[in-house]
């Protein structure tokens, strides 16, 4: 929509009854350190495998409508990192607390995309709200994929570069905001050099936390 809002329609076809080759999946996962899950029904069968292998587990709960939706329970239970969009909630605090009550990991980290309002970072200790960032000369064209890039930017910074939570949130927001400035396509993703250029510029005027 012109105001940046969106409505996505998903055709899952046979994903509810698909039976993955668990041995093959385990072999692939054994070579990994992080497993990022979306909500495909068959992928829930890989959650205990990833946990047993000691992988960090990240789950994208997408646009939550019902905070007590049983379909998402397994993904919430196994996750070390949880991402979701707050498009259906003006204040995500109640959703965050509900998720925390269903997950026993003391180090659980929750990241919430709030579109033009920014994003939220929640730990067991506190919930922090971050205002959105502005990438000059990069107007918003298409918001599809922004949530995915928020996750990619945050996880790669926090897990693989061992950066702080706040720096990782900024990198995630840069990736998400840049994605909104191009038509949705895997050929237009932000590069490492572009990310670093925006990072250095924004470090001069860091995003504000509320």
Q: PLM features: what roles do these ranges have?
A:
Residues 1-129, 133, 163, 190-194, ...:
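Ribokinase/PfkB-type carbohydrate-kinase core domain
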Residues 108, 135-206:
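Conserved post-catalytic alpha-helical subdomain immediately downstream of the catalytic base
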């Amino acid at each position: 929509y012109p105001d940046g809002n969106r409505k996505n329609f998903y055709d899952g076809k046979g994903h509810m009854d698909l039976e993955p080759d668990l041995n093959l999946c385990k072999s692939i996962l054994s070579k990994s350190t992080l497993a990022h899950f979306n909500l495909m029904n068959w992928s829930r069968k890989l959650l205990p495998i990833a946990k047993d292998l000691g992988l960090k587990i990240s789950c994208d709960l997408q646009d939550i409508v019902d905070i007590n939706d049983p379909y998402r329970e397994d993904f919430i239970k196994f996750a070390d990192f949880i991402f979701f969009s707050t498009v259906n909630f003006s204040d995500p605090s109640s959703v965050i607390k509900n998720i925390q009550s269903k997950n026993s990991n003391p180090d659980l980290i929750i990241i919430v995309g709030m579109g033009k309002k920014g994003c939220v970072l929640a730990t067991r200790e506190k919930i922090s709200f971050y205002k959105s960032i502005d990438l000059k000369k990069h107007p918003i064209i298409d918001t599809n994929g922004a949530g995915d890039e928020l996750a990619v930017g945050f996880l790669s910074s926090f897990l693989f570069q061992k950066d702080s939570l706040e720096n990782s949130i900024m990198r995630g927001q840069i990736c998400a905001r840049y994605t909104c400035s191009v038509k949705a396509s895997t050929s237009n993703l932000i590069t490492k050099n572009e990310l670093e250029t925006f990072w250095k510029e924004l470090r001069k005027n860091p995003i504000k936390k509320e």
